[in-house]
């Protein structure tokens, strides 16, 4: 495992040939200055990119209007669906589905036993959400937004499941308390301990053969 960026990384977005990430550039008078970098797999170089490039990658073509729906566009979670609609999740569990012109189609909450969802991931025509306070993952029908399946609970294999990443027929679950990356098979719903880190893992992303992890100390190439 190799550290490729030191510092606080907020969000990593996969590209077809690299990644874009937001990070803390500075803190001035308690205000966080956010900047953005891109890593290209073609040459391995880091490039500073504009905020609009980050927003386009995160929210799709109508990124300006979509970002207006977010209280904080850095911490908000988003999924650009195959039909170009965008599903948004805020820190407090409030959620929205926007048409490709940013028209609001649905709004509601993703909560379980009072706890807000921390992240969302798309698998086929279903939406998966993580709930750290209850140590569960929930599957929703994307058409009806009704809960269909729960993994975890009182004897959960998770320890505050947070950020999700779907790769093939599995969802990778970051667990900040145990510092473990847990793999869930989305066909059999079997749960495996995939990787154990020496510090809390906050995000996992895979692009091609390259795997990345965001830890307290920075961004790593696994």
Go through each PLM region and give its residues.
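A short beta-strand motif characteristic of beta-propeller blades
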Residues: 1-4, 63-70, 103-112, 146-156, ...
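An edge-strand/N-cap motif at the start of beta-rich repeat modules
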Residues: 1-25
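Repeated scaffold domains used in trafficking and secretory/extracellular systems
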Residues: 6-15, 50-60, 65-81, 113-124, ...
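Conserved beta-strand positions in repeat-built beta-propeller and related beta-rich domains
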Residues: 21-30, 88-92, 129-135, 173-177, ...
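Beta-propeller blade signature
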Residues: 35-40
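Short loop/turn segments that connect beta-strands within beta-propeller blades
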Residues: 41-44, 61, 99-102, 141-145, ...
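WD40 beta-propeller blade core
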Residues: 96, 138, 180-182, 220
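Intrinsically disordered, low-complexity segments enriched in Gly and acidic/Ser/Thr residues
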Residues: 145, 149-198
